[in-house]
Curated annotation (Swiss-Prot):
Stated name of the protein: Large ribosomal subunit protein bL21
Family (UniProt): Belongs to the bacterial ribosomal protein bL21 family.
Keyword Ribonucleoprotein annotated: yes
Keywords: Ribonucleoprotein, Ribosomal protein, RNA-binding, rRNA-binding
SUPFAM superfamilies per UniProt: L21p-like (SSF141091)
Source organism of this protein record: Pseudoalteromonas translucida (strain TAC 125)
Quaternary data: Part of the 50S ribosomal subunit. Contacts protein L20.
Annotated GO biological process: translation
Amino acid sequence: MYAVFQSGGKQHRVTEGQTIRLEKLDVETGAAVEFDSVLLVADGEKIEIGVPFVNGGKITAEVVSHGRGEKIKVVKFRRRKHSRKQMGHRQWFTEVKITGISA
């Protein structure tokens, strides 16, 4: 059984027991989280597609940790002007473990 849900402006395909990284959620470590914006639920041959969300669809997860991703370097370079600027960015994330999928 797998499901597709929406969180942080992105869509994620998950199965029960899977650990994934989402955009940062304001929830403490060890807390339970529920996602109601389920787009698709598939169980073997039975596939339920939402318009836009599945009625009664719910994904429960447990927050494992919070952290920051790897650094991305951004370079702004102006040719022939002897000018350059280098910046870095590390995006915050929340790691969750999927504990249940229901439709």
